């Protein structure tokens, strides 16, 4: 039986598309090990989390909710009931939620949550990506990261940091849907090409780890950014700043030392390493 040429051409194009974006061999995260994959911290191959915020900021109640929440999300549960051990469930939940947000930028399936508190019990609902969507999204992001790994392979740390800044800032800020839950993870950045500060910061965090640069995620009520290490010191890094300016603008590199919201302190500030007052753009001379 002869196959129609149009059909054959379509099959070839589709096969190439899926291979290139989802199944092409990649280098992978250099920190990923079999031991880590068997740990409770493992979510996917994008990121190795040391769960810094869980280990350094949680009391017993917050730790309990953190474990409960992330376990439910990894299992794809859309709803759960959490029995709190002490009063003040909502505040405890928010602290745990924020810590997970910072510890796990690779958790692309988790878009948002809502909850009701009654009789020291939380009734929590999660908005999650579908399992297939999350699987394909993870595969796509792995392949996007691999391109950056190849581009930065022989770069100095300064060149790598500038590369990530330029790469992230080249994407568009989604002003139309800036409060959409779908924009709050790295998924929107890597698969749609648009995002908001949360997506930009999480994408930066994933990229930094995969190319050998140490960094932290930072957030407050209004914004999310990074602290990045350069020559043993930590500096403010906010690629969202770059999305608002042309690359030839004097303000383009403002994010190497400033944040979009004008503050450089976030939640859990007391557990971060000291942050330099000197702007990274001054150190880099850009």
Q: Which role does the model predict for each range below?
A:
Residues 135-189:
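Secondary-structure boundary elements
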Residues 2-25:
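Sec-dependent N-terminal signal peptides of Gram-positive bacterial secreted proteins and lipoproteins
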Residues 86, 154, 190-194, 198:
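Short, charged/polar micro-motifs that form catalytic or ligand-binding hotspots
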Residues 18-155, 265-286:
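N-terminal accessory/pre-domain segments preceding catalytic cores
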Residues 199-262:
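Hydrophobic/aromatic-rich core segments of domains that either
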Residues 181-189, 195, 203-206, 248:
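Conserved active-site-adjacent core of cysteine acyl-enzyme catalytic domains
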Residues 80, 171-178, 191, 242, ...:
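Repeated polar recognition positions within modular binding domains
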